Amino acid sequence: MSNLKQLRTRIKSVKSTQKITKAMQLVSASKMAKIKSQIANSNFYIEAVSKMMSAILSIDMYELSIEEQKFFNTVPNKANLLIVMTSQRGLCGTFNYSIIKQVKNDIKELENKGEQIKLIIIGKKGYEALKRQYVNYIDSYFELPKIHDENLMLQVKQKIMSAVENLEISNCVIYFNKFKNAMTQIMTRQQILPVAKYQDDSMIDNPIVNLVGFGYKERGVKPINNRRATSDIVGESKSIDYNYEYEGASLISNLINLYVNSQINYALLQSRASEEGARMTAMENATNNANDLISKLVLKLNRSRQAIITTELIEIIAGSEAV
């Protein structure tokens, strides 16, 4: 009888856990749908800013102010700034593992080359995984708020802008999971600075981009005699001529601010959508596993009950025959 009681208690416990995992699955699905909507709404803006920044690469760097040039050129013998985006909470499968593994591999490669490293970590899980081994490299750590927060973007942007303006870094790379669907998140390492030629989503087939600190060559600059640049119009095949000369002295500086902010925002949204997708899938698997376990436990319970009943019947029959 004690065995039956233990089985009933365990079935009750698994059913309780199943309710929790099912609820978490539904919550993550709702959050993921909301973030996907935010990504869709921001894609056009992010693409437009990225293409305008890419167009500036055709401008003679001498036409830019010294402060502006810092965002387009590599400063030798300075630190590689790595921004690592992970989750604040667990229960999301291998979401954090792929990011942390890639960051560790890249840090090892940079160390072998004798290069300096700075880390900005967003999310508790990434911080916990990296602090023991790389505490001396960690420049800043930010907790990931429960909802999308512009405050976080501004703080990270300020860290990047300050590091560039003070000539503390040679390049800036951001690590995040790019959302494809609920079951697939693609680990992406994307260069923010120095500003590189714009690439559309086709880069997703090979998301790990070669960078200066990882062996890429400093880009060449095509000189021209004024602050004009040509780029493709977003969503169209023809080109547009951007004239920055007559738009105010601070236009490019403002555009740089928008660009850095949009890149951080893009990575945060992609990371959040990927996290919720990974958590939804993990909780769905947990719910299904709980259901399978309940079926096995119920079968075991029924067999145990049948065995007890059979034993009791045999005892009754044996007793009646003895009489």
UniProtKB/Swiss-Prot annotation:
Subcellular location: Cell inner membrane
Example GO molecular function: proton-transporting ATP synthase activity, rotational mechanism
GO biological process per UniProt: proton motive force-driven plasma membrane ATP synthesis
UniProt keyword Transport present: yes
Pfam families reported in the protein's UniProt record: ATP-synt
Coiled coil regions, renumbered to chain: none
Key words, A-Z: ATP synthesis, Cell inner membrane, Cell membrane, CF(1), Hydrogen ion transport, Ion transport, Membrane, Transport
GO cellular component: plasma membrane; proton-transporting ATP synthase complex
Major localization listed first in the record, in broad terms: membrane
Membrane topology: Peripheral membrane protein
Record-stated family: Belongs to the ATPase gamma chain family.
Subunit text: F-type ATPases have 2 components, CF(1) - the catalytic core - and CF(0) - the membrane proton channel. CF(1) has five subunits: alpha(3), beta(3), gamma(1), delta(1), epsilon(1). CF(0) has three main subunits: a, b and c.
HAMAP family: ATP_synth_gamma_bact
Physiological role: Produces ATP from ADP in the presence of a proton gradient across the membrane. The gamma chain is believed to be important in regulating ATPase activity and the flow of protons through the CF(0) complex.
Protein name as catalogued: ATP synthase gamma chain
Organism: Rickettsia africae (strain ESF-5)
